[in-house]
């Protein structure tokens, strides 16, 4: 007997759901004898053979983890005092184990279906309440991508709302974090905004500005009193945004109390690891009067059909998927998983615990400053919370060298100054080691004596007087037992991939394998500061370099930037690259962006942000781009044509035959081709956008490449470009190219990039190709099983779809009154998250099963949809009442089941419509949520404790 003595790679079979026999059965149902034959029928001839991925084998889970561990070991974890918006923190173990590492939390989707999302909606409402309380502003959103992009959103927010309409100048304090100023400049330039950086203490006339950004405390550590300067800006009809440190706000007067219009910042230091720069949750808070102009998602309190308190995403008409180029922002994701960590950090510690952390951090800072002064070191400024700037003169360079020799990183400010930031993890020993480092051979100060004699460095006039976090949720769960059970109760309310498939079209809710997730919490990746010297981040640099090469091979592009920390930011970076390319050729006048009418709303919103004008092109009856209309508009605008943004396979789930011709039309008329990579899961290993006409694409690593959705973030949206666009990829002050940063950190959400590295390394080229093929097979199998019950709206010329299919429910609305919303809510009773509703066509469901779902799960979903069709028939023929039926009343709760039953159908039909549900039943915690009530009676902070008790 021959035994394979190598490490067997079973990962591909673990990742892909259907077994060999199931695969063959599905192929037979479609009329094919092999996966390759089916693929050949789906992929257009014009783009076959464009893949350059290769067919190399992947590594086993154990071998890939070992290889990545060796790479991670090349990162050097020095003691960091760099600060600058990034701080060491302790992630409480119960939050790490029960939230961050829990698939019930990290595999969930954005809570657009509120009935199956009450748990994470409550956690996000806690986050909003936390932010509102600490900032002193009444309304806060459910997180943004990072502090720098939140500042950029605040800038455009001020532009929209300022009454100084003739102004195009925005004041940014020189005391803001440098990475924030860099992103402001990137965002401002295409919009014709001038960013004026200066010292607000030296400002004279402010009438030229529509808005201002101030840092609180300042990046150099000082705590300035902004009350007078805010009044001056307001007198000039300008709005004021304040970038505030949340921990400091537990002790300092909040921005809302000195009349700031907006507060933004990062929640990273509330339990979220440094992660070489991300992902972290930013926040955005503002006045109630401005709520409809606020970017990002907003959780609001509403009621369900029984009048019971229920949560939902509020005011969605602000979002880009609805308002397109008129949207407040192109942001379509948030940082939900990280916001939930931060919110639970506050829940666990409570107001007293947060203040203790802040007071201890500040006390250590004050003692450190007193000791340094005693040693003759010049401390700049009289006030501080946790950060000190030291005037070190000509000794600065040697001081950095000496510090690194001792395993310490100081902040590099300039040739004559260094910075020090303390944090939650700082100790007496740290303070004493800094005295020793900076004091040379002098005798050390007496820590105990200084602790007894040193007072606060916070200005007395700015000490916080208002209470924080008085809601019971922040004062109840302080034992680990209570927090563990609270997190479990919330998770039990939600439907995530750990319960059932999430068949959302255009979202690619595939497996997020445990072996891919494990490296995220390794200290070597989690505890590195993004601005640590390059020699200390060699592990990250090797991993990112290898990942860039992997993504180039998968897409056919020549270069990749990993910086964009969401798909929307990848789109933006891609269009900026196109814009910069045209300008480099003396064609800066090219500003027309063609976008098909079927495109996701992010595309036109992004084009607007990049300073382009959107021209919409038509689609034909089969959902394809109308090539003749495209040609006519490309020719009409040829002198100003900048780009086309096109999704491939199409947003309608079809491989359009004319994609090569479309690319040629744009190139012939002087434009560049932006191919949206949202649907890349149908192409990896089969065809490559960089080889069939694309100049740039963004990829959604949280779709195709296995980063989990986290309940609505994090995401990663790297861009791939052809060589002529490579010089225009995003830069960063920490990189060789210092211009054009689109987010705060050089590698964006760096600490989750190992997930994609692991996925590609384990799958190999052959496995990635097979994943694409199986995604296409699963989608076509569902379409074939359901086509006799629901019309499949779009197919290719061969009657096949790509990796997703669209079911048309509009005829059923006409015959039965049953809407797509009714079907979506009824699926909850069957234990399923609804497919994508009414996108890209109103009244339809778009289904994407991915390659990870087994045939059994596909059949379970199909059986549910078929049973729902039978219920619709019963409404059509009068067997079920048109108003009182299981669809109109869905979803059904356990409380309703045990109460008085007045419906004209049975309890069993309501909650056990299929016998298979008896084995495992998901019970929604609320009935159908009233969206209109929630928007008319907007409440975006924690409701009374009685509401929680009722729940």
Swiss-Prot record:
Keywords: Oxidoreductase, Pyridoxal phosphate. GO terms for cellular component: cytosol; glycine cleavage complex. The keyword Acetylation does not apply. Its cofactor is pyridoxal 5'-phosphate. The modification N6-(pyridoxal phosphate)lysine is found at residue 703. One of its GO terms (biological process) is glycine decarboxylation via glycine cleavage system. It holds the Pfam family GDC-P. Its EC number is 1.4.4.2. It is an enzyme of class 1 (oxidoreductase). Coiled coil: none annotated. InterPro entries: GcvP, GDC-P_C, GDC-P_N, GDC_P, PyrdxlP-dep_Trfase, PyrdxlP-dep_Trfase_major, PyrdxlP-dep_Trfase_small. The glycine cleavage system is composed of four proteins: P, T, L and H. The glycine cleavage system catalyzes the degradation of glycine. The P protein binds the alpha-amino group of glycine through its pyridoxal phosphate cofactor; CO(2) is released and the remaining methylamine moiety is then transferred to the lipoamide cofactor of the H protein. Belongs to the GcvP family. This is Glycine dehydrogenase (decarboxylating) 1.
